[in-house]
Amino acid sequence: MTEEISGVIFGVWFLIGAALVFWMQAGFAMVEAGFTRAKNTGNILMKNLMDFCIGTVVFILIGFSLLLGEDVLGFIGKPGFDIFTSYKDFDWSNFVFNLVFCATTATIVSGAMAERTKFISYCVYSGVISALIYPIEAHWIWGGGWLSQIGFHDFAGSCAIHMVGGISALVGAAILGPRIGKFTKDKNGKITKVNAIPGHNITIGALGVFILWLGWYGFNGAAAKSVEQLGSIFVTTTIAPALATVVCMIFTWLKYGKPDVSMCLNASLAGLVAITAGCDVTDALGAIIIGSVAGLLVCFGVWFLDHVLRVDDPVGAVAVHMMNGIWGTIAVGLFATNSAPGYSIADSKGNELVGLFYGGGFKLLGLQLTGFVYVAAWTVVTITIVFLVIKATLGLRVSEEEEIVGLDPTEHGLPSAYAGFAIMDVSGDVMDVNENTDLGSSEYATASQAKKDAAVPVVNATTPASASGIHKVVIISKLTKYDKLRKAMNDLGVTGMTVTQVMGCGIQKGAGEKYRGAELDATLLPKVKVEVIVGKIPVEKVIETAKKTLYTGHIGDGKIFVYDVAQVVKVRTGEEGIEALQDVE
């Protein structure tokens, strides 16, 4: 094969690889959607679409030139508009390839901050990552900047993309706070329990992992310069995630008694992230070790975030991308071997560098650690500033009601991403209020006395007493009021209740929404139906407590229905009447 033909073939493969990396956006969307709740699916899909589209706009305007423009002091590329002024001679292939890499960095953050982030805020910080944070540090590594000059090696982005995205995800999730119900606290505010909030569709999540794995062959292999090097990259890109998944399966099987499906899916991605930096310079043994460590590291990372840092990461983005991005970056300094095809790691003087375990000493390891520290520091400082500014201006987090109802209807006017298949995901988990939830003041407490008098008094003069002395009270209210209602009933002494999550609307037919510009008919809204049976506790007190708890003064506060109960029989003991309720009320 002549050099010219080889150049053409690999030029075409380079663009095919870019297309595969773009296809990874679909994989990220599926993983995030599957690992979160159905009521936020549309929001997840919209964010994964818009981070690429917004990223394209800002990458055209500034990001690409900062990354690959003429080097300025090893720190930054010279800003320019060659795509507009010199299109005929523009490096189109490099632009597309680096654009899809840039979009990957931004989309990693989405998963860790899912289900409680304002959409407008996501658009802003996603744009900043694509315009400034990623291009500048990527210039250090790939654009002729200072890290590339000293011999730092990150072939496809364990550091430049995954670690940066993972660090941004950690900082964002920490500032944002956990989802409602993720952590249970005692009266002193101390976290006593970590609650699982399962995703709604593991099938979609698994599909996303397979899409990402396929795309990773382009992610890691697109820049290969020979068939031999491409083949070696494909081998390491296959071995590492496979070993990571097997190790994770064994670990979770031993620890929990059964192999954990979602953790194994995360482990596959962790192995891919870890091998990305050194996929071109490691051999099969190195890939086995790198992948095996990644499989354990992702398990540790998920536990560490939940039980030590108390940071809520719904999809495991921090454990997968940050921790294994760091590991993959360091692993180059341990496992790089010059037996790999096309090996080209050298210091600023042109001296070849190899990994510690292959006789190269600590020099390459030191360079890799240096790169990790500086890129991590750059990312932490810049993204923290971005998130704090957004929090102080636009606000990062949606309201309590928006979070509980779901971001699909509240942020996008989409009643459900699964219209025609399911009414809505209104999770059955009890959602405890935490310090990151803005509850505001009680609407009843702040209402005028006239409104209180009109809304709350219970008139029972015309209601005949129940022959059995037992009443059934059915309360239908907004889902967002359930936690307060449950606590109010408990304080009153009513501990036995049946709770059903339902969809419905009153005469007002819910809030009108539009789909593709057309008006939707009556919108069914998520409601909660609470049924309690009371005997010794006066029914008037139950009604009054419920009304005070549910009152806002607006349409949709709910309804209370009271029924006579002829008889109650406890199946276990055969007790009847009031006695059958003694361990319920």
Where are these regions (language model features)?
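Glycine- and aromatic-enriched membrane alpha-helices
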Residues: M1-A461
